[in-house]
């Protein structure tokens, strides 16, 4: 790569990423402030993504709606659904877009040079020059809109994201994941639902949605990633000429804030809906959740991956076994999730009962105290480290290109530190260090410090409620009936007309 000739960019760092047999470069585009990570190696399955840091102040789902809508046509590619066209006609090995609690990412992959260049162009034009400013119908179709078939019909709400999130909000696991995240970080972006809460989505206006895109979809708030065997100089010149050089650097306030630690654990209970024929008994979820350091501490993060295995997944895992022996829940699940700035360690009892919550917490903490005193099973720790190391070395991610998984793991650190994209691609030394620490009491000390002595935790229960969904639907119907009652004749006629117009728009060919 001829960096001297690429005058539009500044080289921030260059690293030999020996763990993945590649060379890594971190660049900054001088004019726009865009950040670019390059991983150069001989992998023909090339990967590109552009991501944006997208914190939210409410649960209207605006980043999720933008993720859907920017892929509904752009300046260069004005067809109504370029995404579907690409799925049908491209040689891609991966093509998608994902909304996370704090970021939105648009990745593509292909082994064909020409196809890869085209995919890059379509996605870049989509995020920077979408048709959303020209056609409000896109927002209505993908986000939400009122529908009125004729003036005597009831008013309803429709929209792709709105309907998708209604489904997500009705599953107990979905409710649990959301409540756990909200419970541990009440003063940050994570206290809101970035995907959208169906009760709140209809509060989002078209103008607020456009404002969010204007604010956050600027190159200086972007994370651009290129991976594989390609002419990097050519790609960087294309990025500069076609997109980045059209922007001047601005300040975007999108930093993800740390949650101040709790003085004492919080207890939260939320309902989820079951059918009237289902039993209330043995149908609750109990969850013990702790915030663990930050994602910029790679050794701590990997050590907790290992602890997750040793405590909850290994044969005879002591924490799981203690809860099963006590008859709490029919299934015990664990999880260490580092997809947020402050990772979360959780223990979940499924098919449990709310009245066992105190006992559930007591057994977890008594068992952890005993483990600290008596020591963890050394074989389980070593097996956990070996398993994580093997997965990393093999880099076999099924249908997902390994360059994509590497790229998403870059975001685990890069999103929170602009100068640190490669933290989780340099971890073989960390695995070696963890093996050395098995006999030193290091893992037991982590349990004491981060699980027992740490008050930044939450106890969450998700309880079954018969007919909850039906009740919520009835409340919505009543609310919409009241809304319609307040409309004038002219407003009702306009809503009927708008409904017809949107249906016509949706039926028009691309």
List each model region and its residues.
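N- or domain-start disorder-to-order transition segments that initiate the globular core
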Residues: 1-43
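Short, conserved beta-strand segments within well-ordered enzyme catalytic domains
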Residues: 37-39, 49-51, 107
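Active-site recognition of the HExxH zinc-binding catalytic motif
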Residues: 60-72
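Short pre-active-site segment immediately N-terminal to the catalytic Zn-binding motif
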Residues: 51-61
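Short, conserved catalytic-motif segment at the N-terminal edge
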Residues: 44-48
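Short acidic-hydrophobic surface loop/beta-edge motif
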Residues: 23-30, 266-277
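Charge-rich, well-structured scaffold segments of protease-associated domains
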Residues: 2-7, 55, 69, 73-76, ...
